[in-house]
Amino acid sequence: ALAFMNKGFRASDVLEQCRKLEAADISYNFFYLTGISGAGRGEIGAKASAELFNQLHPQIIESSMLTIYKTSELYQEIQRGNWKEEGEIEKLAELKALIENLTIDTRIVTDGASNLIQVRGHLPADKEKLVGYLEHLIETADEAALREYRVNLRHL
């Protein structure tokens, strides 16, 4: 996902630079964009990210959900058939997979307008509660109602 989204760095770069921050006793946070891996790949991306995050010590992992606007490059990629957006329930499942696979001591939050829900907790202590909450939402959510929120989100 990092290469496709033209981020200009690899997971190994993140690991190297964050270890330098830790060696200098500088705290840092991570930002996780739920949905960036695309349809059918969210849980793979979540597990790969958790594997990287588990090697480090971020203070906070903040997650937001991808919202695609018609003026974005990603929208053009969708129009060309090069990328497909995750559904809203799939985004919730991706967030659940991220939390399930994190083993480090950190805070996790979902703040910002792009999030359908607010999740806040301290891992690993709140993992079971957060996963249970997400499982309930995944089982009971209405994709069309969730999508309605996303398409009416004018700005972030």
What are these regions (language model features)?
Residues 51-156:
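Auxiliary Fe-S-binding modules of radical SAM enzymes
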Residues 1-25, 35-56, 76-90:
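Conserved non-cysteine loop/helix-boundary elements of the Radical SAM core domain that shape
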